[in-house]
Curated annotation (Swiss-Prot):
Entry protein name: DNA methyltransferase CcrM
InterPro entries named in the record: DNA_methylase_N4/N6, DNA_methylase_N6_adenine_CS, RAMA, RM_Methyltransferase, SAM-dependent_MTases_sf
Domain of life the protein comes from: Bacteria
Reaction(s) catalysed (UniProt annotation): a 2'-deoxyadenosine in DNA + S-adenosyl-L-methionine = an N(6)-methyl-2'-deoxyadenosine in DNA + S-adenosyl-L-homocysteine + H(+)
Domain RAMA: 271-373
Protein species of origin: Brucella anthropi (strain ATCC 49188 / DSM 6882 / CCUG 24695 / JCM 21032 / LMG 3331 / NBRC 15819 / NCTC 12168 / Alc 37)
Any GO BP annotation: methylation
Amino acid sequence: MSLVRLAHELPIEAPRTAWLDSIIKGDCVAALERLPDHSVDVIFADPPYNLQLGGDLHRPDQSMVSAVDDHWDQFESFQAYDAFTRAWLMACRRVLKPNGTIWVIGSYHNIFRVGSQLQDLGFWLLNDVIWRKTNPMPNFRGRRFQNAHETLIWASRDQKGKGYTFNYEAMKAANDDVQMRSDWLFPICTGSERLKDENGDKVHPTQKPEALLARIMMASSKPGDVILDPFFGSGTTGAVAKRLGRHFVGIEREQSYIDAATARIDAVEPLGKAELTVMTGKRAEPRVAFTSVLEAGLLRPGTVLCDERRRFAAIVRADGTLAANGEAGSIHRIGAKVQGFDACNGWTFWHYEENGALKPIDALRKVIRDQMAVAGA
């Protein structure tokens, strides 16, 4: 089955089955009208940079530098570029889920104008991320600093966009248990990853490295999420999404790019479920009520709980509360009360005895969560 859908053949707000895991051929704003409201989880946008190039650029050996001079990167004025930017961002905001996020990448030529439009339209900026290139192109004329980075803006749909995905624990673990910083070091796309045509020329002038897209998706999405790329180009977003178990929808108007992206995505082998399991922190784990521990038979009413040093004790009641010193309440309230504190995490404070050893009741909560995970698999 072909990946390609023609924008004008899709109905307005087409059903998910009509566009999921496909490339929609057409203008990005018109094509976005074909997607329903709140239908995508993450957007990655690599829009035209509106490069202000003044003539040809040559290396010291007089060979010409292959720069971005395609017609799709040409705008009559900054005002025209701003109008274009506002139009596609408005269309993207409509299809983004309330808890979704958008990534936009750009250079110094355009990223500040894009950032201003994002804020004006109600997006809420979460981070700017610097992609530092290990192998940037030199500044051949020697009139400026070497431009060795691009900037990504990461934003939620609006200020109240709570519940967006950020796989903090996974990013930290992947970074040797140190918080992932907002400056990322990757080489530009070269070697076998760089798509070439039959003449050995680059298929796309600004092909992004798969490692960059992989980090974005691993940080801000989950397996099964829908990733939209309104400027699909050579299909890096689709290829990485397929490999990482995400769905994608790309929008592209240039047939040569569509052909290259289609062949590229068709060749991708998705990773298995075990490789795609995302490490999560406690905040992302399902809530478990203490009464569930009793209902599962892991503790019985009348069991005496204590702290790890056996200074305080409480009795488990049949209704899932604890009783101590004439007071009754939740595991958290009674834990705080016996210590004279304002708050307490009862799961880690209270312990039960098993084979002569004290264990935190949090271990029983883990048993319940494991059962929930199996039931939901």
